[in-house]
């Protein structure tokens, strides 16, 4: 009777895990959707909490900046959680894990489980990331599962969803009878109010982010939880904590005979042929317990000495990884001091000095997602290899709104400081200049005051002086030519955004 009640308890516990995974994935989606302009100058929800509880981002960022980042201290809770319940975060809470499990359930095919292809690679990548961070090369954001997920969603899938939805309802509005439109219109209004973004956005390297996320999902057809088992450095870090976890799954014994059904169905490949469960890899999904024919697998307190061997790195691999991490800045030239900064690399308002900004930026893409004007874009090689996917302002796409401070509010690491409105109005992110070979009053003698009309500074950073020019007909005429008041210009870029000429002006 006791065994039956215990069996029922674990079955309900497994169902609870599925509910937990679904709940936290939906919570992630909710916070993702709320990382957008909603008509308010402040963000109502802790939309950056996912990145603030990420131990990989927290540890690597603090190592890079050599200080404690208060914003990221919640990550300690996940570390403590892993010390008690092992790597259960990956099976119960992680939205990337929820996406992969849901994708396989809906679109995957059932196949025999296989041994993990590259069991040591996540630990190698983790060591490489942490040592590189110490020497000023931030790499965690490139492989962190949360950064990959949010970048792919915000820079490709979400804008694509909005484009398809708006196009569909525009088509129905134009072609359906008025009676049907009365039914369709409330549906669109509901989607616009609850799910769709404030405006249609486009990201110049969005397909790159989509490609990376697509590879992670497509790898499910190679092996279940391929990314989690073979690449994820966050999983490796939580796995290290799991080595001393107080609770874990306890595997079968010799009385199981030749069954080994648990090893064949384990989504993480955490059970070996001797039915020993590796706590460093096990995510406590409880599949093995539910499907064990003899109900011999249990969940209980386990001493570290009784655990599976886990994944260990040889001394040679460790030294090779450490050496590569040390020479990376020199070999790749990612931190050469004699390279002049690109004048067109304009960081968002509140950005710290470039070296510390790059060390703190985790490439989450939330500042770009929340940008009202779509002016913030991901940079590729313009900022060097270490600066890929970090944000910069492309004024031809959108300007920095004078009364907006949302990007600093969503930044999880403090790479972008939270500015008060008075500070924002004075914060200089760049400097405007005129291409006199193209600007209409200079190049063609045609009057134009568009840039000055849109300048948001109270005293107008763009001013005019009367000049005599020769127009295209060879006639002399007086034209007001613009110039920049350096003391007033904050580099918001609206003058370039609104300029009637195409291209750089």
Where in this protein do the model-derived segments appear?
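Non-ligating segments of multi-cofactor redox enzymes
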Residues: 1-275, 280-281, 286-505
């Amino acid at each position: 009777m006791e065994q039956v009640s215990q069996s029922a308890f674990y079955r309900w516990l497994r169902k609870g895990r599925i509910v937990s995974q679904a709940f936290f994935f939906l919570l992630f989606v909710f916070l993702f959707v709320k990382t957008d302009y909603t008509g308010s100058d402040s963000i109502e929800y802790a939309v950056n909490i996912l990145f603030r509880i990420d131990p990989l981002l927290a540890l690597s960022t603090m190592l890079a900046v050599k200080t404690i980042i208060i914003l990221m201290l919640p990550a300690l809770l996940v570390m403590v959680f892993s010390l008690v319940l092992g790597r259960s975060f990956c099976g119960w809470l992680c939205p990337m894990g929820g996406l992969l499990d849901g994708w396989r359930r809906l679109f995957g095919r059932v196949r025999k489980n296989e041994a993990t292809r590259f069991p040591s690679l996540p630990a190698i990548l983790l060591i490489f990331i942490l040592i590189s961070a110490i020497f000023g090369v931030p790499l965690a954001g490139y492989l962190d599962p949360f950064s990959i997920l949010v970048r792919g969603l915000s820079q490709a899938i979400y804008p694509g969803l909005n484009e398809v939805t708006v196009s569909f309802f525009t088509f129905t509005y134009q072609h359906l009878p008025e009676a049907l439109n009365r039914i369709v219109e409330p549906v669109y209004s509901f989607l616009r109010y609850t799910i769709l973004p404030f405006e249609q956005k486009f990201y110049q390297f969005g397909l790159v982010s989509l490609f990376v996320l697509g590879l992670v999902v497509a790898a499910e057809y190679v092996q279940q939880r391929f990314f989690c088992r073979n690449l994820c450095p966050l999983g490796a870090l939580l796995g290290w904590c799991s080595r001393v976890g107080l609770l874990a799954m306890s595997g079968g014994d010799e009385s199981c005979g030749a069954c080994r059904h648990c090893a064949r169905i384990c989504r993480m490949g955490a059970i070996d042929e001797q039915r020993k469960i590796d706590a460093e890899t096990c995510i406590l999904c409880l599949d093995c317990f539910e499907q064990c024919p003899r109900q011999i697998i249990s969940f209980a307190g386990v001493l570290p000495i009784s655990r599976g061997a886990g994944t260990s790195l040889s001394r040679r691999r460790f030294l090779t990884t450490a050496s590569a991490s040390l020479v990376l800045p020199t070999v790749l030239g990612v931190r050469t001091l004699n390279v002049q900064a690109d004048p067109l690399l304009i960081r968002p308002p509140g950005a710290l000095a470039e070296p510390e900004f790059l060390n703190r930026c985790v490439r989450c893409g939330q500042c770009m997602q929340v940008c009202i004007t779509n002016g913030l874009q991901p940079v590729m090689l313009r900022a060097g290899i270490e600066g890929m996917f970090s944000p910069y302002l492309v004024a031809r796409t959108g300007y920095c709104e004078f009364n907006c401070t949302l990007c600093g509010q969503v930044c999880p690491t403090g790479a972008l400081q939270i500015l008060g409105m008075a500070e924002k109005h004075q914060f200089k992110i760049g400097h405007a200049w005129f291409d006199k070979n193209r600007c209409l009053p200079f190049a063609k003698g045609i009057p134009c005051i568009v840039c000055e009309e849109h300048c948001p500074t109270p005293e107008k950073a763009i001013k005019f002086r009367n000049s005599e020019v020769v127009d295209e007909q060879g006639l002399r005429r007086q034209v007001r030519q613009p110039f920049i008041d350096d003391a007033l210009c904050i580099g918001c870029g609206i003058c370039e955004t609104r300029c009637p000429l195409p291209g750089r002006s």
